[in-house]
């Protein structure tokens, strides 16, 4: 049945799979096959939603990213509204396939009436340009970047601290390591547990940070999680991810404290033994 699917079902299903964290490589291969053979029939919204979904599932290859970016340029971005471009720029940024023409056009738009989510997405593309590609000279205008930063940070703050997060924080307390929960960097990136003086960011990753199949969870972080780690590293932070499937099986405080000590030893040994 998959082979008979035609747009718009393809990008709708791809979007739904990404929202559920299901990385169905076979399905995405079929969808990109349709893109390759009939891209001129795909609307801008379909291409952008597909790029976002594939990037979220870590299935946006350099070839696929180039195909979609080239088509957007070929159309001179006709039909690409603010939401479409925010999805596309985020997808390219998150997958490490930035396109200067796409970014440049998106950054030149008037974003004042854009939805908060769109501003947050294009701001993350702005961070890639700022932190990883400063030589390209592409950036959002300062007022837009400021607004995007605020919406990006607000979205992170809406995610409440989990029991897992609090438990990891308690382990730091047992080790007598000073730390800050829900720390915000200058660029507006929220860190679960931070030691600013050591530039160490601890990211506590629950199940929603990982991809899954139709039958079970995997241990592969999703595109958003990998992207955030990369932005933190580009900003000069060392990142220590602590996954729920590593932490929760440790049955007592002693085991969890020992685990945390082992994780910290290669990254920040100066924090230990205080």
Task: Indicate where each model-derived feature is located.
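Eukaryotic RNA-binding helical-repeat scaffolds
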Residues: 1-274
